[in-house]
Amino acid sequence: MPTKDKDLTMNTHERGGPSIVAYLFALPPVIILLVYKVVPFITALILPFKEYELTKGVSGSAWVGMRNFSDLFNSPFFTKVLSNTVTLKLEYIFLCSISAFLIALILGFIGSKFWQRVFSTIFLLPYFMPAAVFIYLVLYAMSNAGMFFMYSTESLMDPETFRLIYPILEAIRNIGIPVIIALAAINGRRAVDNRGFLHTQLIPTLKSIGLFALIQLSTLLTMDYEFLSYLQNPTIYETADTLDTFVYRTALMNNEFGLASAIWLIKYAVQLVLSILIFFLIKRFFIKGVFPSQTKRAEGIRKRGSFVGVVLSFFVVQLYLLLTTAPLAVSVVEVFGDGSQISQASSDLLSGLPLHSSFTTYAIGITFAVLVNMVITILLAYPLTVKDLPGRLLYTIFLIIVLNMGMGGVHEYLFFRGKGMHNTILPYLITGFFTLANVFVIKAIYNTRYVSVEERTVKGVEGDPESFVKRYLPRVVKPILGLGALQFAFMWNSCYPGQLVYLADPNKFSPVMIFRNIIMGAQADVYGQLAFDVIKLGAAVSIPGIIMLLFIMILGGHEIFTAQIWKN
């Protein structure tokens, strides 16, 4: 007997195949993309060929042809920052991929999904706290270096040592993402396959880590600016200066917008080519391994697990805690022991900060931005789920082009400044509307997990309003909720570009930005006398992100974490 879903498919086919009405659902968000992404992008194509002056604007500034590119390629600084960017990125990808592969393989031996979630949540904790808090705790522990750390804070003043420390710290913070993706792939494969270790564990893990590494390669010339900025100082620019930090200094500190735009355009062109190539490579070889179909369960499936796997997992987690959480916890205990002596100094530091109003304002603002983001994601993803829809390839390429525009470029800064939004939180909220990586995650989850083989053999799979409401929406509710929680955590924990670039008024800063300014300020002893209250504040500003993590782990569907790979 045909299923209800199959009847929907047949009815759509009888009405004439795939309906281009699907594009009408995507039209409103596409218009928003054109206004807030494509229009500024046109400026990005012009700026590299002009000597931009703020008083004259883009149209009034003089054309200089290829001079900005000539100056760039003749500059020894560009060659150096390009080399640093590629080196640090590749070191991070290699270290994180190898470590995640081994950890996921070990955790995969645990048959209980509950214990898998417990262990994997531990690895995800650093990612869901603000980078400012994570780095502060690391630096505090290093400033009181003992048995847990080989390096002290003075090590960060040495260029060669920094090249070793940075990839390790970034891998520690982000390793939970590929691990949770691999575990989701393992469990998904076990639900439909009753074969052995090779097919149900090793291959899904390899494909998941391969997916992670490939997506990271598609952003080869982009680093996590905010994370890097907390560790960087002029004494280590030799190895620590990257394209992102160089552009930030060149544009916003030296007002060399044309030169900075030339760098951005080179980055964009290289990463666009890489992204298109890697997209089709992933689609061909990796998607089904990471997002296996669960429309049919294999016969004889039983939960697999082993005592040895649980023991190994326990020791791996203990080692991770020893290397990361333990020294931080020891530091917290030391600080709490001296807390009674510093209340007045901390009061002087924290007095006058708009913490309560900031929490309220940003919680409401981010919630609104996330809701808009979820609606935009649902509508943009719908045409990608319609089989044989005319023009779908061009639509896909358009989304990849916009995805690679990223955020925080000089052109976006000038766009929002021109609209009178400078020194407001509006750019911060508006840039949060767009996470096009989420669109491809929804598409991959829906097409591989929720559409049966029988439906895919029928030409002309949906695309009309009835299918959108009755079939598509119910199946994407769970992943879109998870992606929304991820977006909330990402926005809450981030200062760049929304605040570092657009905000100058301290009264409008987010709680995380307030925390950042405290630990970056030279006027206070935040690693000594004031550490007690700084750590308490760090714990407070980390709470929303941790709540989002717990919500996602309870919700399940952890393939959604692939959306975060584009942000790392």
Language model regions located:
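A structural signal for multi-pass alpha-helical bundles of membrane permease subunits
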Residues: P18-V290, G309, S313-K459, G463-N568
